[in-house]
């Protein structure tokens, strides 16, 4: 969930009582809640609470992983005032696609646990001033009554109240009582009553006997009469009475048939038992459907416990105990499983589990489950089962949970269940849950899914993941003969319900060609229309019509729009064949001719489907005829209406969302697909599309579920003849129809009037035109248009308004205002097209009505005449536009209103550009908002007749003939120059791949942009893309798109995930193998190679001067696995193994030249170290390797002809091992050294060692500076540690994200501790630097632990080691003997007290990195975080952008970080071209020119 960012938030102790209790103030935000949970209470409640922080245990909220509170909005309590009625209100924003989610529903445990702030309330009241770390909070009782469920994306609100206290004999609080109400959107969801928690010492907790059955309890159980289960055992799985761990995991994946068999309706079940992380039942050793005292079922489940399971350390910090809510959730999971086992789902069809409304669920906790190896045993007895008033089945159960501690020798015996609950500590019931009640609620009566799932695009098909299965058809050249198909007579009896209605699309022109198939036809409430578009002839992509296989042809798309969906997408979509689900637009709006390919799909298990709907790229094509109906209806023959452009851009998204199976993630069959918003950029408005194929590359950028809604996000890019002219981003939603029953619009349901009505503009200022077909308004509006004008829309189909109201010089900006109204007619042509079974007006046509209003304003105000434009016509102005839809118009709507406010009118270079913002209403509800509508008035061809005479006419033979007779397209010229401001200049500079021609008026200083070089008078800003930076051979050698690699951060901080993420975007990443044991390096290499079989990737080889076996083991692994790129770092001298790796990859090409397979990047910080990598391998090392048989004579001979490394990465002031040298000093020295040695060694040009730069590269300026100094590539390091893929913990990421360049210092290094070598680390938020330096000081001062003063040794043990020296030494011995297999080192240390001291100190130094990477909560102050000064520049660079964790709520992606740094460097290079040109006088240091990462790349 995104963090709520507060600027200058006031701490609670500075708030007034009114601010604390008003409910309108954010009393505590998420950051403060996290601090309370994991950090210091004094920082949250105020200085008076600071003394509590000295206690190792105190009342806390759970840590981040189970912290289920987002904010506190009310605190009505006072410190040290234990009063009844104290109150607190909290909120929790349920995350979408959260890791605890049950397929959209909020699980039982989260609903209950999100009311956890009774902990914070009693803490605020001061309980720890009494407990003083000796007593800890434990929940005892609670009764929960549910009235519904919550869904992802909703906000839970908890009103928590204190109802009483109990005191000990010494007057201290022993227990407190509380209750809460939980609401969602004002609706009561949960009542929690009888809440009770106590405060206990360790001794009191240990003495607890658990839940003890009284004699009355036992007597009552003995009197219970058994009931008959048979009426409810609909189809019990009697063959399956135990479940294994694997089978329980399978139920999490919704695969019930694999566990219980294909009978009893199991294949049709589409229900996820729980989130994988939330699975609290690992196995079920017993299912007895006639067992238990009630005879309705006895089920026994088991949860395996390990000390390191996730739920212990997060609940709570330094007081680990399993949360009762999680334990109780296991009861819910068992009951769900049993109800399905009985076959009750056969009575409902598709279902959801819901709590039984109004039924109390009582929980008693009488023992703590602290970390241990063992298991929980759940003993569930069904006490009631039946059907409610809606005939939904329900079940109620009692559950006892028994804690079995293997470490205490405890066991569980099924045969002795009766002994539990009798007070025996070895048979202790820790939780007693009475009355858990669930029902199976019917989802719908829609058609169920087929029992056999067939993938849309099976993995084995050659078409998946590649476009190479068939070459995409090239965009055709303009041809006057490429026209729309001739109409074919439609048959009669075409409406749904007519027994004579055809079942095939016999009127499709393509079906009339011999050998072609005929698409099927499914009648609807509307009569079909003629086929408006057919593919251009001769395209080989249009021949194979196999459903679900790329490409999808005209036949597949015809099926998708009005036939059988499964005949387009494959049999998995059969359930949609007869549903009312949205389809691809039909007839006149069918603007996807074919889907050429889909790539980048990720075939994984995702909810109930077999691919990740967030991953995929599709190429769609539209063959645009020269005389399409929309051209005939436009103002001139070559003008494509903006609505059609929008549809072409967006419709491929509608195909891709289905190919990615998003509809299959929805529970219902009748689901609706709606565009929500978009940002688009018309980058080239001079392209003629007639007779050409428009290609659309649409990429999915994300998919998420929000309750019953799925949201899909895409980017798109349109091109013709490889010229990109339109691009943008958009999002769509999949909805159930009920969502639109009461649409809220843009104003939260409030209806409003158009602006001129609300502002009561005098009627005399409003000029109205009736523009219905045949009405006089069409003629009068255009009566005064200049001679030869083509400004009017020429057909009724191109008109979207009945009446237009214009107010000159009015609107919000005083530049012009237009209002239009249309009476919605259920027979409007577009309802049949969009969509065939789901009629709704396309949003694009609503936007088009706004364009029509802007055109009317331009005509009314005679903008063409005022600016002397001859033969004016309508065309497009390049630029950006955005739209947002929050409602719809359907055939049931009555009236559509739209309005526009002109925001600018600019005349330049022979054209006039009009820009406006607009809104649209559906029956008084404002539902659309559009910004930056752009219309251009430009000179065109003289009109063949007056504009008035063509009003309402159809496209005549004259128009068609004029289209055919043109020999070439006639784009409207934009003029030789265009005046631009600084904002526009920056926008143009950011178009990195386009040259920019500029001039400047010497008098006014006005900048002008030209379309060409303007006879040499313009400054030329050359394109600069990523490939134009650095040395291109670096990119060619490693197969990457950028002159950059992400450097290896040791101990897996540069993780496999980080390397894979970079590699998938063709960026080289180096895995941080240094300091890791061999088995982890092997696992990482296997993972990387599986994900990147063709690369690119590198693995770090770090010099190990004290363990040559480790270096050899790594090289053995690299050669075994075929690792072809190694980053060699920290080498103070060349070693046999690094030379062996290089030589082992050498062979001869056919021409005798050396073929290099194994590449080395040498990471150095000194000239003498660079020299050893630039020269050939030393002779003595080659001879040694030959003698040992590790290389051949041939390989040695070849090694004498090549440098040891292909690349040198010059490491300047950086994190970890560093010489702190500035890059502007060391980089030129090493480049000069390389040049000299290259000549001296006589290498050919192909063997020139490239020199790159690393250290301090945290922003575009640093990258640009290094590259301008001659770096062939750059290396990033510290900045990648902040990224979500790095192998460290969120505590470290958080600390790094708040660091500045000065928050670093030097501290002793573990690997070369004795030599006094230091490394650069983060000092903010950790005591590691001072403690590590203290250890080195002691090492230098004393020869042994025995010679240290006792107080010094005690300080080391208590403050630094935090354990006894004997324990440290034992762990050190275990590590060297069992992990490093180096007992000799320990034997030496036993004889050498100084070495023993060194090894123990290195124990701390080494573990400090592990604690940081693993996020060990109780060693936060000892975190060792390698960090360079680049972190300060990086944090400043991303502040306030989408990469900023405080803005996005998540840590950035390594790909985005590195691409943005490089893109910024490209931009700066172009900006510097202006700075250095004497013809341009521009203040480039202006804040307007600062590069900021504004969107995902």
Curated annotation (Swiss-Prot):
Coiled-coil intervals: none
Dehydratase (DH) domain 1, as annotated region: 271-422
Stretches the record annotates as Enoylreductase (ER) domain: 1026-1470
Alphabetical GO biological process terms: fatty acid biosynthetic process
UniProt feature, compositional bias: Low complexity: 944-958
Single GO MF annotation: (3R)-hydroxyacyl-[acyl-carrier-protein] dehydratase activity
Biotechnology: Polyunsaturated fatty acids may be beneficial in prevention of cardiovascular disease and treatment of mild Alzheimer's disease.
This protein's UniProt keywords: Fatty acid biosynthesis, Fatty acid metabolism, Lipid biosynthesis, Lipid metabolism, Lyase
UniProt pathway: Lipid metabolism; fatty acid biosynthesis
Region span, Disordered: 944-977
InterPro entries named among the record's database cross-references: Aldolase_TIM, FabA, FabA_FabZ, FabD-like_helical_ins, HotDog_dom_sf, PfaD-like_TIM-barrel
Listed SUPFAM superfamilies: Inosine monophosphate dehydrogenase (IMPDH), Thioesterase/thiol ester dehydrase-isomerase
Chain segments annotated as transmembrane: none
Record-listed E.C. numbers: 4.2.1.-
Top EC group: lyase
Cellular component aspect of the GO annotation: cytoplasm
Protein's job: Polyketide synthase-like protein; part of the polyunsaturated fatty acid synthase composed of the 3 PKS-like subunits A, B and C. While the saturated fatty acids (SFAs) in Thraustochytrium are produced by the conventional fatty acid synthase (FAS) pathway, polyunsaturated fatty acids (PUFAs) including docosahexeanoic acid (DHA) and docosapentaenoic acid (DPA) are synthesized via an anaerobical PKS pathway. PUFA synthase assimilates fatty acyl-CoA, the product of FAS, as the starter unit to synthesize DPA, and this starter unit may be butyryl-CoA, hexanoyl-CoA, or octanoyl-CoA.
SUBUNIT field: Component of the polyunsaturated fatty acid synthase complex composed of at least ORF-A, ORF-B and ORF-C.
Miscellaneous notes: The homology between the prokaryotic Shewanella and eukaryotic Labyrinthulomycetes genes suggests that the polyunsaturated fatty acid synthase subunits have undergone lateral gene transfer.
UniProt record similarity statement: Belongs to the thioester dehydratase family. FabA subfamily.
Domain remark in the UniProt entry: Multidomain protein; including 2 dehydratase (DH) domains that reduce hydroxyl groups to enoyl groups and an enoylreductase (ER) domain that reduces enoyl groups to alkyl groups.
Name this polypeptide is given: Polyunsaturated fatty acid synthase subunit C
Species of origin: Thraustochytrium sp. (strain ATCC 26185 / S-3)
